[in-house]
């Protein structure tokens, strides 16, 4: 995806200032809402989250009807199966979305948490505490659940959300956001704490990520093209998320029963998500007898195996039932390969050798490193802190699954008694 549109018609060029104004007006409304939410008590936010969950369940037929229209349009456009899976809602998934809001309501509120505090020799009392980021711009592809996840996490952390989802999920997102706004209104909270930028024009994204002074952070969540375009063109701070060229490395001291289970779970559980394995690395010392078993297991599960993987294969995020395979020379060979081809998301080693595992965890440059565990565990809920707004693959300001604390900044509060600084 590129944010720089192809040559624009005269009508589109004429509408450009209007789109910019629409985005900026929405951001200003979000700013007002964010300032109100920053001081809303935890109990009030939690009641609103439960009200939103109730409203989603009460309007499930309306939500599924809108989603069915999106799916019909996507199928007519020959959308790949993996993308259809991301787009699709059903009663069970809607139940899960509502349950996610209730789970967020039960999590500790990070706002106001004191990270450190002390008194200086001169008597000044210092306290560093968490505060909301402010206005969070979310740009994401065809996953309606992200709409609700973003709402829940931003609300609980005292932020306002400006959402720009994919046009492929436009009807689903509109139905969900309308329900969420009504729930906020019913709890006397500002409905503008969640707004959907509904224009399909890609310049909407550009205006959002260049709204300095109005948007505090932009979080792109989707494929490599979307993320790269946002990071390249943004004039507001961004948090890079999600591209997952994840590896499973089977060390020479691996238990092959364990390796097979981990490999299949990492690849086939949900191949269209960013924590799915995309490359199998096999230690040269065991390749002769391990490769037939592991490759056979993948093929039996319906995975297309790229044995003669080239440079493009090794850098590809398949997001499908496909995987690249490479043989590496020991743990150092695996480390070198992953640090060259990985995207800093999640990497796994399967081994019974503690020294090899420690060397791997210390030297792999990634947000999450698994030892004898599936890459599928890199997930906010699985990590024990509820829904996530994304999985950051950068090192500032957050890294790994981003929950509530990652949607805050800090503020220093200094108490004095008429203190003045000496000349």
From Swiss-Prot:
Its pathway is: Amino-acid biosynthesis; L-proline biosynthesis; L-glutamate 5-semialdehyde from L-glutamate: step 2/2
Q: Where is the composition biased (Low complexity)?
A: 1-14
Question: Which Gene Ontology molecular-function terms are recorded?
Answer: glutamate-5-semialdehyde dehydrogenase activity; NADP binding
| Pfam families per UniProt | Aldedh
| Keyword terms of this UniProt record | Amino-acid biosynthesis, Cytoplasm, NADP, Oxidoreductase, Proline biosynthesis
Residue ranges with Basic and acidic residues bias: 15-25
Query: InterPro entries, per this entry?
Result: Ald_DH/histidinol_DH, Ald_DH_C, Ald_DH_N, Aldehyde_DH_dom, G-glutamylP_reductase_CS, Glu-5-SA_DH, GPR_dom
Q: Where is this region: Disordered?
A: 1-25
GO biological process terms on file = L-proline biosynthetic process
Superkingdom of the source species: Bacteria
Quick one: where is this thing mainly located? Answer: cytoplasm
Q: What class of enzyme is it?
A: oxidoreductase
PROSITE patterns assigned to the protein according to its UniProt record, in alphabetical order: PROA (PS01223)
Which cell locations does it reside in? Answer: Cytoplasm
User: Which Enzyme Commission number(s) are on file for it?
Assistant: 1.2.1.41
Question: Can you state which reaction this protein catalyses?
Answer: L-glutamate 5-semialdehyde + phosphate + NADP(+) = L-glutamyl 5-phosphate + NADPH + H(+)
A GO CC term? cytoplasm
Q: Which family does it belong to?
A: Belongs to the gamma-glutamyl phosphate reductase family.
Q: Describe the function of this protein.
A: Catalyzes the NADPH-dependent reduction of L-glutamate 5-phosphate into L-glutamate 5-semialdehyde and phosphate. The product spontaneously undergoes cyclization to form 1-pyrroline-5-carboxylate.
Per its record, how is this protein called by name? Gamma-glutamyl phosphate reductase
């Amino acid at each position: 995806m590129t944010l720089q549109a192809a040559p624009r018609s005269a009508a589109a060029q004429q509408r450009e200032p209007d789109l910019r104004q629409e985005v900026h007006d929405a951001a200003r409304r979000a700013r007002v809402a964010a300032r109100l939410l920053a001081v809303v008590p935890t109990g009030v936010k939690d009641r609103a989250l439960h009200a939103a969950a109730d409203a989603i369940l009460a309007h499930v037929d309306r939500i599924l009807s809108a989603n069915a229209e999106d799916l019909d349009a996507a199928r007519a456009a020959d959308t790949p199966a993996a993308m259809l899976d991301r787009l699709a809602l059903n009663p069970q998934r809607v139940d899960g979305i509502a349950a996610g809001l209730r789970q967020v309501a039960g999590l500790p509120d990070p706002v106001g948490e004191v990270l450190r505090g002390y008194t200086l020799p001169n008597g000044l009392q210092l306290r560093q505490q968490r505060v909301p980021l402010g206005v969070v711009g979310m740009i994401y592809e065809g996953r309606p659940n992200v709409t609700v996840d973003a709402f829940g996490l931003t609300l609980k952390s005292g932020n306002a959300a400006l959402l720009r989802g994919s046009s492929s999920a436009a009807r689903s997102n509109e139905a969900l956001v309308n329900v969420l706004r009504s729930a906020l209104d019913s709890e006397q909270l500002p409905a503008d704490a969640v707004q959907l930028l509904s224009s399909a024009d890609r310049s909407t994204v550009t205006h959002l990520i260049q709204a300095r002074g109005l948007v505090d952070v932009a979080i792109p969540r989707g494929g490599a093209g979307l993320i790269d375009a946002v990071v390249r063109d943004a004039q507001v701070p961004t948090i890079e998320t999600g591209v997952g060229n994840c590896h499973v490395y089977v060390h020479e001291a691996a238990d092959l029963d364990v390796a097979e289970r981990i490999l299949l779970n990492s690849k086939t559980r949900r191949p269209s998500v960013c924590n799915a394995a995309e490359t199998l690395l096999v230690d040269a010392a065991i390749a002769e007898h391990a490769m037939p078993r592991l490759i056979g297991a993948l093929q039996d599960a319906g995975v297309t195996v790229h044995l003669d993987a080239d440079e493009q294969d090794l850098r590809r995020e398949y997001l499908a039932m496909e995987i690249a395979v490479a043989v590496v020379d020991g743990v150092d060979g695996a480390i070198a390969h992953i640090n060259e081809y990985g995207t800093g998301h999640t990497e796994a080693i399967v081994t019974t050798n503690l020294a090899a595992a420690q060397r791997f965890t210390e030297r792999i440059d990634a947000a999450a490193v698994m030892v004898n565990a599936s890459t599928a565990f890199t997930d906010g809920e699985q990590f024990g802190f509820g829904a996530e707004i994304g999985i950051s693959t950068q090192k500032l300001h957050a890294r790994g699954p981003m929950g509530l604390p990652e949607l805050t900044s800090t503020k220093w509060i200094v108490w004095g008694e008429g203190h003045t600084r000496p000349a």
